[in-house]
């Protein structure tokens, strides 16, 4: 079946009661595939398979990634693996890097290697993590993903997400970070365990972007589908729902052609693609022509 964009989803998303932040900028696509917590990727990192990572970096950028998330989380090896991965990625592609680590020493080793301003994924509203990461953030001044998780663990409600977001935004701005450098991640959790997780995040994203004009909203979209069949279908749908609430950065699989086509269509329909330039470019490049089933 040909990939289609569902107008009913947009009708739901754009009800007048929703407080949608008006933006013109397109989505920041952060490629998620260089993640050593994934079995195949971790094995390639353990074997120091340079060609594997060159290929996966190129594939993501060619598919439309604006930035690459790099997770070097091999047990006991992150201090060596993260800088190694940064060097490989930068030798291969020219996009900035999002360093996916909570280890301050690993970040201290990797950040000076970044040729462009990096992003850190992520700081949370946990005192121990703040104490560990804040000195590194202040020294190197990267862009920052502020994950709405506190000492009690992952948030269950919209209100918990808002409380964590407020504390983190206030903390970072008090330390001199511009709102434009802060990407609030409302914490995507699987709907397979708690069906309300999806709606709670949607409401939180809308309220965060309304409360803090200038702050970006990001999400690790694929977490929502964990434990369910046809994960790509859920990821593709959820990304569009989030965009209608104000999401402007996503850690996603850019090699998912349907997801990327949906994002380009959503940008055009939400007024975030001036003169539909990105949509038309994707059309000319054949990126909207999805395979059809026999």
Positions of PLM-derived features:
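Extended, intrinsically disordered, low-complexity segments
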Residues: 27-43, 51-55, 61-63, 252-294
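Alpha-helix-loop-beta-strand connector modules within alpha/beta enzyme cores
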Residues: 78-115, 202-217
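Catalytic alpha/beta core domains of metabolic enzymes, predominantly
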Residues: 132, 140-277, 283-284
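Active-site mouth loops of central-metabolism enzymes
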Residues: 30-55, 121-124, 151-159, 224-232
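Glycine-rich, proline-tolerant flexible connector loops at the mouths of alpha/beta enzymes
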Residues: 61-95, 188-198
């Amino acid at each position: 079946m040909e990939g289609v964009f569902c107008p009913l989803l947009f009708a739901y998303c754009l009800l007048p009661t929703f407080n949608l932040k008006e933006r013109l900028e397109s989505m920041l696509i952060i490629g998620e595939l260089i993640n050593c917590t994934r079995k195949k990727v971790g094995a390639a990192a353990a074997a120091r398979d340079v060609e594997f990572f060159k290929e996966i970096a190129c594939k993501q950028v060619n598919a439309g990634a604006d930035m690459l998330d790099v997770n070097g989380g091999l047990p006991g090896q992150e201090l060596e693996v993260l800088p190694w991965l940064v060097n490989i990625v930068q030798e291969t592609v020219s996009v900035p890097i999002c360093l996916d680590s909570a280890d301050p020493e690993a970040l201290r080793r990797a950040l000076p290697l970044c040729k462009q301003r990096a992003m850190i994924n992520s700081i949370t509203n946990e005192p121990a993590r703040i104490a560990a990461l804040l000195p590194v953030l202040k020294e190197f001044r990267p862009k920052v993903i502020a994950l709405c998780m506190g000492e009690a663990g992952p948030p269950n409600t919209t209100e918990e997400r808002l409380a964590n977001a407020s504390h983190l935004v206030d903390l970072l701005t008090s330390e001199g970070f511009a709102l434009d450098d802060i990407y609030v991640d409302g914490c995507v959790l699987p709907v397979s365990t708690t069906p309300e997780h999806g709606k709670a995040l949607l409401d939180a994203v809308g309220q965060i972007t309304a409360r803090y004009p200038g702050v970006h909203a990001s999400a690790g979209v694929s977490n929502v589908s964990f434990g369910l069949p046809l994960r790509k279908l859920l990821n593709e749908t959820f990304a569009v729902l989030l965009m209608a609430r104000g999401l402007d950065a996503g850690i996603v699989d850019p090699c998912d052609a349907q997801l990327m086509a949906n994002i380009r269509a959503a940008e055009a329909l939400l007024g975030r693609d001036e003169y539909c330039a990105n949509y038309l470019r994707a059309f000319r490049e054949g990126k909207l022509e999805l395979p059809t089933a026999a």
